Curated annotation (Swiss-Prot):
Catalytic residues identified in the record: 306
Binding site for S-adenosyl-L-methionine: 188, 221-224, 240, 260, 277
Keywords on record: Cytoplasm, Methyltransferase, rRNA processing, S-adenosyl-L-methionine, Transferase
Classification of source organism: Bacteria, Pseudomonadati, Pseudomonadota, Gammaproteobacteria, Enterobacterales
Subcellular location: Cytoplasm
GO molecular function, one term: S-adenosylmethionine-dependent methyltransferase activity
GO cellular component term of the entry, any: cytoplasm
Protein name: Ribosomal RNA large subunit methyltransferase M
Length: 366
């Protein structure tokens, strides 16, 4: 099994392919990417037969920006007989994965795949039963075993394979299912909620997104991102020349500061979170974020980088490298992650967490 399927946002296949080719090459796992425009997935074909498994084991999934999910697969199964699609699929998986912890029958996230998705949901139940009898799946779902993937690209046409549950997306198709809150000021609120799910482990929410924390939202109007912070019972400085939603102001948790997010400087020294979703050149936003992190004005930040029309992967990589270089120069240890979220459009979302400073700084980081 020398192929790795990577699911991505339709229209971003080239970026996904450029990224996996680059990062696989850094680990001396060589191959080539098969790209079909607007397909919603990329296939990276390794030259060595066992390198697909090596890639999804050794390259941290969290280091990928444009992939929503990945799994290693064998050859394409074609012309599955409508009267018995299950037997060929089970046959392909035998000897490949044993006692899998979960079955996911998936498609790419495209309009053309919506009808196929309905079939996948119905097909999952009988396939799961037969796979359990054949030993391909454990008798109960467990996060400690590999995930079995069956990926349909057309009716009667699928790839079969697996991913490791400790190095994949926990979500079906790599998409968290979030519901838009009726009282939120804008749909952008779902970006920050999804970012929390993707970047912060669920068992750390109570500690890192805690009641009573202080936060800053740069470019806050009308308050989609502030809404998520208020919902977590934080005190928020919302910085924007535009007005905030009255419903947020009525909570008493929001202080609206009518000024430019690029010029604002915090007066408090105990700000845990700074979030930012401003429509501006990515280099300018990256420079501002680096300034906040280097000066210790916040402990963690989530921000969006708007993407140019061309060379998107190169642009994002350049901006992330700039932030890393600034942190290194000032002796600051930090974790940086970036992902094009489901609710992102022509942008990527970045999370940076300061861990400690090598030089004297904030007391909570020594």
């Amino acid at each position: 099994m020398n192929k790795v399927v990577l699911l991505c946002r339709p229209g971003f296949e080239k970026e996904c392919a450029a990224e996996i080719t680059d990062k696989a090459g850094q680990r001396e796992i060589f191959g080539f990417a098969r790209v079909k425009e607007n397909a919603g997935y990329v296939i990276y074909e390794c030259y060595q037969p066992d390198d697909g498994d090596k890639l999804i084991r050794e390259l941290p999934f969290s280091s990928l920006i444009f992939a929503r999910q990945w799994f290693v697969v064998g050859e394409l199964l074609q012309h599955l007989p409508p009267e018995d699609r299950i037997t060929p699929i089970v046959g392909m998986l035998q000897g490949v994965v044993e006692k899998g912890g979960e079955l996911r029958v998936e498609v790419a996230d495209t309009n053309e795949s919506k009808e196929l998705l309905k079939f996948c949901r119905k097909f999952t139940v009988p396939l799961r039963a037969v796979l359990r009898d054949a030993g391909g799946l454990a008798n109960y779902e467990t996060p400690k075993r590999p995930v079995v993937h069956v990926f349909f690209i057309a009716p009667g046409c699928c790839y079969t394979g697996y991913s490791y549950s400790n190095n994949n997306s926990p979500f079906y198709m790599g998409i968290p299912r979030l519901k838009f809150p009726a009282d939120a000021p804008s749909r952008s609120t779902l970006k920050l909620e999804e970012a929390f799910h993707v970047f912060i482990p669920a068992d750390e929410w109570d500690e890192r997104l805690a009641n009573g924390m202080w936060a800053v939202d740069l470019g806050a109007c009308p308050g989609g991102w502030t809404y998520q912070l208020v919902k977590r019972n934080m005190w928020v400085y919302s910085v924007d020349n535009g007005p905030m939603a009255q419903s947020l102001m009525d909570t008493g948790q929001v202080t609206w500061l009518r000024e430019d997010g690029f010029k604002f400087r915090p007066t408090r020294s105990n700000i845990s979170w700074m979030v930012c979703d401003m429509v501006e050149k990515p280099a300018k936003v990256a420079a501002l974020m680096a300034q906040w992190l280097v000066n210790g004005w916040c402990r963690e930040t989530i921000f969006n980088l708007k993407l140019p029309m061309k060379k998107r992967y190169e642009e994002v990589s350049h901006n992330l490298a700039y932030i890393q270089a600034q942190l290194d120069e000032h002796g600051i240890n930090a974790q940086i992650q970036a992902r094009q979220l489901y609710h992102d459009r022509e942008e990527v979302t970045v999370h940076v967490r300061r861990i400690w400073a090598a030089v004297g700084g904030r007391r909570d980081e020594r």
